């Protein structure tokens, strides 16, 4: 499996979720299964089957997070050499030349992306189009909504 780029904050969020799943959610589900078993016949015991389904989801998510963390390439953006180019983890301000509006994005890992908070995934069309470019560059990016022309205004290593 390839390394998965992730910011320090993204790795911390996954560790927090993993801790919650292992130390809170998993024991809670085990208690629910034990309680449901006390109701008797397991074939027609909806509570038991629901708890077992929750257990499957929980264990699957635990494995997924552990795999991501074991393959994570954790990047501390504040320690990157400011090359003046757009790279993973930077905050980049662009002018959308189609609508003449300034937008600011931070390029993060897939699990960290949240477009409402201007956190865009490294694998998104916008991030892929901006990676490697520098201040002043004009970039034409194909998005699901059509082509958008951006000019890079500022690159910050925050």
UniProtKB/Swiss-Prot annotation:
Molecular functions (GO terms): DNA binding; RNA polymerase binding
- What InterPro entries is this protein classified in? GreA/GreB_C_sf (IPR036953), TF_GreA/GreB_CS (IPR018151), Tscrpt_elong_fac_GreA (IPR006359), Tscrpt_elong_fac_GreA/B (IPR028624), Tscrpt_elong_fac_GreA/B_C (IPR001437), Tscrpt_elong_fac_GreA/B_fam (IPR023459), Tscrpt_elong_fac_GreA/B_N (IPR022691), Tscrpt_elong_fac_GreA/B_N_sf (IPR036805)
Q: Which UniProt keywords apply?
A: DNA-binding, Transcription, Transcription regulation
- Keyword field contains DNA-binding: yes
- GO biological processes: DNA-templated transcription elongation; regulation of DNA-templated transcription elongation
Concerning PANTHER family, the annotation shows:
TRANSCRIPTION ELONGATION FACTOR GREA
Q: What does this protein do?
A: Necessary for efficient RNA polymerase transcription elongation past template-encoded arresting sites. The arresting sites in DNA have the property of trapping a certain fraction of elongating RNA polymerases that pass through, resulting in locked ternary complexes. Cleavage of the nascent transcript by cleavage factors such as GreA or GreB allows the resumption of elongation from the new 3'terminus. GreA releases sequences of 2 to 3 nucleotides.
Q: Per its UniProt record, what HAMAP family does this chain match? A: GreA_GreB (MF_00105)
Provide the family line: Belongs to the GreA/GreB family.
Question: Under which name does UniProt file this protein?
Answer: Transcription elongation factor GreA
Native organism: Baumannia cicadellinicola subsp. Homalodisca coagulata
Q: State the encoding gene.
A: greA
């Amino acid at each position: 499996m390839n390394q998965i780029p992730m910011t320090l904050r993204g790795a911390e969020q996954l560790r927090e979720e993993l801790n919650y799943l292992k130390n809170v959610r998993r024991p809670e589900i085990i208690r629910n299964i034990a309680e449901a078993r006390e109701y008797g016949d397991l074939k027609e015991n909806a509570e038991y089957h629901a708890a077992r389904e929750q257990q499957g989801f929980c264990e699957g998510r635990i494995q997924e997070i552990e795999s991501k963390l074991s393959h994570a390439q954790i990047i501390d953006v504040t320690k990157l050499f400011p090359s003046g180019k757009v790279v993973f983890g930077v905050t980049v301000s662009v002018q959308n030349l189609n609508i003449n509006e300034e937008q600011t994005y931070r390029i993060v890992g897939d699990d960290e992306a949240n477009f409402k908070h201007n956190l865009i995934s490294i694998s998104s069309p916008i991030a892929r189009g901006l990676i490697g470019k520098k201040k002043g560059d004009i970039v034409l990016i194909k998005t699901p909504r059509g082509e958008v022309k951006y000019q890079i205004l500022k690159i910050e290593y925050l």
